[in-house]
Curated annotation (Swiss-Prot):
One of its GO terms (biological process) is photosynthesis, light reaction. It catalyses: a plastoquinone + NADH + (n+1) H(+)(in) = a plastoquinol + NAD(+) + n H(+)(out); a plastoquinone + NADPH + (n+1) H(+)(in) = a plastoquinol + NADP(+) + n H(+)(out). Keywords: Chloroplast, Membrane, NAD, NADP, Plastid, Plastoquinone, Quinone, Thylakoid, Translocase, Transmembrane, Transmembrane helix, Transport. Its EC number is 7.1.1.-. This is NAD(P)H-quinone oxidoreductase subunit 3, chloroplastic. InterPro entries: NAD(P)H_OxRDtase_bac/plastid (IPR023043), NADH_UbQ/plastoQ_OxRdtase_su3 (IPR000440), NDAH_ubi_oxred_su3_sf (IPR038430). It comes from Chaetosphaeridium globosum (Charophycean green alga). It comes from the Eukaryota. PANTHER family: NADH-UBIQUINONE OXIDOREDUCTASE CHAIN 3.
Length: 120
């Protein structure tokens, strides 16, 4: 039982972190008005009545750019803590970050050669 006592804080925050959003969504669902009118069913286009269909086919290029953006956006999220603790990590931390960046550069070169970054 002593082993589990050091995890009390973790379980407390995990339970609270699950209860608060659940209560927020449940309260919102219970208190939200449920009367639907024709005006509420239309899509909002800056105050202008929409013309045509809302469902259009996107070109795959948008998805490729979005995927490449997300990959490099996540890279910055991982590199920021590394940059903040660079002086404490030493040579091994630098080598690990260098390997991480090199893997991403290889992925970028691969995407570039496959034509994922070309718009034509």
């Amino acid at each position: 039982m002593i082993v589990f006592s050091k995890y009390k804080t973790f379980w407390f925050f995990l339970i609270i972190g699950a209860i608060i959003p659940t209560l927020a969504f449940t309260t919102s669902k219970l208190l939200a008005p449920t009367v639907t009118t024709p005006e509420k069913k239309t899509s909002y286009e800056s105050g202008i009545e929409p013309i045509g269909e809302a469902w259009i086919q996107f070109q795959i290029r948008y998805y490729m750019f979005a995927l490449v953006f997300v990959i490099f956006d996540v890279e910055t999220i991982f590199l920021y803590p590394w940059a903040m603790s660079f002086d404490q990590l030493g040579v091994y931390g630098f080598i690990e970050a260098l390997i991480f960046v090199l893997i991403l550069v290889i992925g970028l070169v691969y995407a570039w050669r496959k034509g994922a970054l070309e718009w034509s």
